[in-house]
Amino acid sequence: MAPVTADVAAVYERTVSELERAGSTVTRGLPAGLDVPAQLETFSFLLTAMVNAQNVVDPHIRWLQASQHRLAVRALWQSYFESHDVLLLPTTITAAFPHDHSEPIGKRTIDTPEGKRPYLQQVPYWITFASLAGIPATVAPVGLTRDGLPVGIQILAPMWEDATSIEFAALLAERIGGFTPPPQFAS
């Protein structure tokens, strides 16, 4: 639904390879049973309901169904984290890009090597995994594209284990170098 660009994928592949060389067991793919389109729909509905709460017109039953789906997603993640310490996900579909506010957000696009992509694929898609379930997510820098643009990775951890994702980010930084300030900010 929101595949990352080739240059971002290359940075992730280098990161995963380095983790494997360090002795980590890496399982590729999302948890079995995770209905990504339904998760995105539920997250979008709950976010819209929250934003429009002052105009509560939507039937309460729809909110209850969405909340029930959120609890099912949370249970799926709990099961996943019984056999995995963390899950690594993209933060966005591209590396850094110029900000353009000349169009309404729904009409904005981002130029990528693969062509124009909807702006709204950039952030909301990947954050739904942690946000809908209410599990911790930490973002860490993992490298630069060929053009020198920064790429981050999202580290998800079990519910109430915020320290796990933060500690993994610190260990990852030790292994792959962590944040590198742009030349104009390096001292």
Predicted regions and their residues:
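Gly/Ser-rich, acidic/histidine-flanked active-site/gating loops
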Residues: M1-L40, W63, L144
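Short, acidic Gly/Pro/Ser/Thr-rich loop/turn segments
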Residues: M1-V4, A95-A96, D162
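A generic secondary-structure micro-motif detector
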Residues: A2-A6, S67, G115-K116, P158
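Short glycine-/acidic-enriched loop or helix-start segments at secondary-structure transitions
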Residues: V4-T5, A38, F97-D100, L149
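Structural helix-boundary/capping segments
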Residues: A9-T25, Y119-Q121, W126, S131-S187
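Serine-dependent amide/ester hydrolase catalytic core
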Residues: G23, T48-L132, Q184-A186
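Structured core elements
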Residues: R28, L87-L89, V139
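Charged, often glycine-rich, active-site loop that binds/positions anionic groups
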Residues: A38-N52
